[in-house]
């Protein structure tokens, strides 16, 4: 599946890129919110599973309306890295690992929710999803759709074997990512090299449109360069300046700021 082979559906605020795999469909919802969030609806035989949640109230309502218009029955939400948006799809089961639940309620995910609440105020749905069903690493079937839960340091990635796709938190071949120091960069590189070995057709992330393995290779090179640059810098300011010089066309400068604090905080 070519990452550019989709039907574009324009909504009032966001948009959906619809990928048709024959027996399954993938609805990639671009929220167009302040955080460039993406949410994914996996469809098979009239049922759907939503991967991650919108976190602004207007996006909650927009995606709910879109799903209702498709006539799909939502079997559950898979919540990994984005636990905000608790008002989305009330009454639908929430699936997560215990580690992801901890990350979203008391760990780094909750710290981000608190920060975004301060930044965005009443527009931000800061209610934390209450997990109804815990899943373990390995294969799980929800709504007749097979997933493979792959634990990570913070939460978990989601493999979708039937469409040869994987969901992870961040990639973005031309934008900065949150990198929590050299060890985290190394772990990310290892995980991305695993994607190459698996030969996924699509890589889905929380903050970018669907990407492919060429984009994965680009990101690996970026992470390796980031670590090299950090090793030669004395502080956050010189680090950011050096990264911007090499990657001047990259977006997500706020993520670079966060990365600099992790490396030099």
Walk through the language-model features, giving the residues of each:
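Conserved beta-strand hairpin/beta-sheet module of binuclear metal-dependent hydrolase folds
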Residues: 10-66, 156-170
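Stable alpha-helical elements in mature extracytoplasmic
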Residues: 59, 63, 85, 112, ...
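Active-site metal-binding motif and surrounding structural segment of the metallo-beta-lactamase
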Residues: 46-48, 56-100, 199
